[in-house]
C-alpha cells in the first residue's frame, strides 16, 4: 500500500510503499525505534498497532526527553 510520510526531524516528505499494514510494520520497514517517535494521522497520535490505509498521510515526530 502507498502512504505519504512527513519526517519532522529532517523536514522531508516521502511516498512509501508499505509492505505491512500497521504503524509498527512501517517503523520496522524504516528502521525507526518506536520508542523515539510519535506517529500522527489527521492531527491525532496513533499507536503502533493501528492499521494503516491506502494513501494515508502520516507525520513522524521525534520524541525529545531531557533531565
Map each language-model feature to its residues.
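Ubiquitin-like/PB1-type beta-grasp interaction modules and other compact soluble beta-rich domains
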Residues: 1-65
